[in-house]
Swiss-Prot record:
PANTHER family linked: MEMBRANE TRANSPORT PROTEIN XK FAMILY MEMBER, XK-RELATED PROTEIN 2
InterPro entries per UniProt: XK-rel, XK-related_adapter
Protein's name in the database: XK-related protein 2
Family: Belongs to the XK family.
Keyword Hydrolase: no
Length: 448
């Protein structure tokens, strides 16, 4: 992951204990925006491979497969264009070229060129002071102590940072509203057709990379949103742990969904739709039960209709993420930030418990009712491998939150404390039940 600007690991001043005092940090350094190039590459690669498969399906008169492949591509592409326009606020600006590129679904390409031009401009002017700067304050943990650091951020660096943030949100939209259904459907087609042409393999590869990248960004954005006052860094070990966790979680979940759908075919549709609708309406049910008012300050130029459209879009994205993996945050529609900034161990535990039960049920359905989908491969072995892969992903998730989270020292309770609390409650309940049963004979004897 790239950082558009960063500050050194340790400020070149003596740390102080009081947060009321401010350490003046050095001028930020800008780095090459690799993530913008990578997101654009994923978008173009998935779009090109999807259109190629649409052409192949049309040539082979496979209208049903062609329709779904094209629909998933178009929906995610349109949502990507709207996301970039919304983040950059282009509707209030006179930028006909950018709007035209978005109209022909090439908005990420022109935005990537703009970001590269901005980077080259900064590179040529390196060492020169910008006339327009703003002050940014963030907390940092240095030797276990919170230190408030202030530094100047130039207008050009802030513009490049806005491009980076826009592409992060674009990658999430593409991953969970386009790549997840595309990957699931292409896996299903491969399963029932018993062949893997090169074009479909390339499309599934791009979709899998996009989903894994989007899920990894979910964790990073969740940490940034929950700890907005802190300057956060994720090292290579932390990013590797998140990537392994998300890859195992998503691949095992999607494979189980595909095998379940291939087993029951149309009978699986009501279960999957009901599952998605429960996730979709859960935040709205909590919002209505709380009796809170709809937030009217998400964007200062938004009407109530515009705010409602944003809330619905965010809810659809939230449901799409939670359908395939954990969203790393809990949606809270009554809040201006739209997320619950608490740690929410209970929400995380509930999600993985429910998903584990669902996966086991779907795997059992495939094992006992499924047809022979893969030659020379045991259904029992396949079912065990998928469940083990999902359990390993949960293990990497617990490892990250227990030992690798960048701000784990701020947790009031960690994973071990939560598990210990559950075990203590269960042990205490068993002791109470045993004491009650042991007292019953003594009571009866005293009565006699």
């Amino acid at each position: 992951m790239d950082r558009v600007y960063e500050i050194p690991e340790e400020p070149n001043v003596v740390p102080i204990a009081s947060l009321e005092d401010v350490i003046r940090g050095p001028n930020p350094r800008f780095t090459f925006p690799f993530s913008i190039l990578f997101s654009t590459f994923l978008y173009c690669g998935e779009a090109a491979s999807a259109l190629y498969m649409v052409r192949i399906y049309r040539k082979n008169n496979e209208t049903f497969w062609m329709t779904y492949t094209f629909s998933f591509f178009m929906f995610s592409s349109i949502m990507v264009q709207l996301t970039l326009i919304f983040v950059h606020r282009d509707l209030a600006k006179d930028r006909p070229l950018s709007l035209f590129m978005h109209l022909i679904l090439l908005g990420p390409v022109i935005r990537c060129l703009e970001a590269m031009i901005k980077y080259l401009t900064l590179w040529k002017k390196e060492g020169q002071e910008e006339p327009y700067v703003s002050l940014t304050r963030k907390k940092m943990l240095i030797d276990g102590q919170e230190v408030l650091i202030e530094w100047e951020v130039g207008h050009s660096i802030r513009t490049l940072a806005m491009h980076r943030n826009a592409y992060k949100r674009m990658s999430q939209i593409q991953a969970f509203l386009g790549s997840v259904p595309q990957l699931t459907y292409q896996l299903y087609v491969t399963l029932i057709s018993a062949e893997v042409p090169l074009g479909r393999a390339v499309l599934m590869f791009f979709s899998l990379i996009s989903v894994t990248y989007g899920a990894t960004l979910c964790n990073m954005l969740a940490i940034q949103i929950k700890y907005d006052d802190y300057k956060i860094r994720l090292g290579p070990v932390e990013v590797l742990c998140i990537t392994i966790w998300r890859t195992l979680e998503i691949t095992s979940r999607l494979m189980i969904l595909v095998l379940f759908s291939a087993t029951l075919k149309l009978k699986a549709v009501p279960f999957l739709v009901l599952n998605f609708l429960i996730i979709l309406f859960e935040p709205w049910v909590k919002f209505w039960r709380s009796g809170a008012q709809m937030p009217n300050n998400i964007e200062k130029n938004f009407s109530r209709v515009g705010t409602l459209v944003v809330l619905i879009s965010v809810t659809i994205l939230y449901a799409g993420i939670n359908f395939s993996c954990w969203s790393a945050m809990q949606l809270k529609l009554a809040d201006r930030d739209l997320v619950d900034k608490g740690q929410n161990w209970g929400h995380m535990g509930l999600h993985y418990s429910v998903r584990l039960v669902e996966n086991v049920i779907m795997v059992l359905v495939f094992k006992y009712f499924g047809v022979k989908v893969l030659l020379n491969y045991s259904h029992s072995l396949m079912a065990i491998q998928l469940i083990i892969a999902y359990l390993i992903s949960i293990g990497f998730m617990l490892l990250f939150f227990q030992y690798l989270h960048p701000l784990r020292s701020l947790f009031t309770h960690n994973v071990v404390d939560y598990l210990h609390c559950i075990c203590c409650r269960r042990h205490h309940r068993e002791r109470v039940e045993n004491s009650e049963t042991s007292c019953e004979p003594d009571t009866r004897q005293s009565i006699v």
